[in-house]
Amino acid sequence: MILSRVRVLLLVLFTTVALYGASETHVVIMHTNDIRGHVLPEPDAGGSARLATLVRDVKPDLMLDAGEMFSGTLISDLFLGAPVIQVMNTIGYDAASVGANEFSFGIHALAARAREANFPMLSANAESPIGEIQVAAIFNAQDVRIAVIGLTSEELMRTGRPQNVKYVDVADVVSTLETVLPRVRGRADCIVLLTNVSRADERRLARAFPEVRLIIGAHDDAELPVRVGATTIVSAGKFGKYVGKVDLTFNDGKLNRIESGLIPLEGVQPDPAIEKILEPYEAKLNKALQQVLGHAVGDLSRSTAQESHIGNLLADAVRAKTGTAIALINAADPQAGIRKGPITSRTVLEVLPSENTLVTMRLNGAQIKRILGRTVMSLSGVRVKLDVTKPEGKRLVSARLQDGTPIRDKDFYSVTTNDYLVTGGDGYKEFSEGISVEDTGILVRDALGEYIARLGVVQPRLDGRIQFSR
């Protein structure tokens, strides 16, 4: 038994009064959440190959995932989550709930992954054209009927990219369960919620439905289980560094005791079968990252305090991609400069590791000036003069379009920025006040890569688009 040789973290026992003399049955559930594409191992922790070994040794009756499976690593993002589903199939998952992360590549990709899965993907409250998503699944484990119901966070409608959730609607979790429970209650001995919702919603569910004795949720922290009334709420941390284990004890078909804990994957021997599955994906990924897009004839510097080579290149790339009059990107978005020599796909990824997308909108001149007066930005299509001795918000001395025309307060201009700034990043409320807003779904780094490939030869360029008054 794996528990005899692998350290168990945070083992917690919740017990009700034992039914002496009654027939006792144990159902073991293992669970994960927030994998986010982390199928490859990190230094001595995590990775699907280690998880496969644990699952093989423990031999759980049910293997479940509470969502946030796909986006978050290159190997998953490049193949739209396909490697994740393939290893989950091999490990032997029985069901997974649908989280916001599963919509990262759009509903068509989600539908494809759901078709590839050898297990049901569940959401009782997310309505979409994807027929492959189920409300619930019922399993027979040790002659105990276990109903597993999936729930998705309503936050999906706020945080999901508009083009990815255009045809999706997420209902309230409590009202949804009020409708779903009567349909499964008579068909199950035990109801388990597999949720990708907030902690507050988990507690609401536990208080509203005390007959639900176990909620398997999705939270980043590796934390102690929570008890709300008779309901136990568990999760297993992020990136597959731990796997959760729940032991349900039934006496004469009634749930009597719940034991739950986390098992770290550190030190577990990887399963060669999973490593073999991932090898071709790794090879294709490495080949893609080695692709040469262009050549830099000199070093391209990065700066958040003044005009920079990489900032100019990025802003010009963004504006070229969308065709707007102006591009405004936070100067801290590029995480690195570019050294003289070949520029590869890996170089672009190092410059822009985030998943930010391009958003177009129309802003009036007064809004643009307020943005420009706060701090230095990477910009294109506009030239500014700043006085950094003034307080933040009052630093703008002048702002003109590229042709020298002054930006007028009441005129409207087409602008491209990124979704980070539109959703309030760095405190720029003006971007959230734009009109004709469209999230293009185009990754900022893809726009940069395409622009570099089009140029072929990249010159470090400072042209005075940001100047400082003396």
Which residues does each predicted region cover?
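N-terminal secretory signal peptides that target proteins for export/translocation
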Residues: 1-4
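Bacterial N-terminal signal peptides
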Residues: 8-18
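Acidic, metal/ion-coordinating pockets
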Residues: 21-284, 303-317, 321, 327, ...
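Glycine-rich phosphate/diphosphate-binding loops and the adjacent beta-loop-alpha structural elements
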Residues: 288-309
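C-terminal catalytic subdomain
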Residues: 341-380
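Low-complexity, glycine/alanine/valine/leucine- and proline-rich hydrophobic stretches
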Residues: 397-421, 442
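A glycine-rich phosphate-binding loop feature that marks nucleotide/adenosyl-phosphate handling sites
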Residues: 262-265, 295-301, 328-338, 383-391, ...
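Short conserved micro-motifs at the rims of enzyme active sites and ligand-binding pockets
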Residues: 269-272, 339-341, 371-374, 396-397, ...
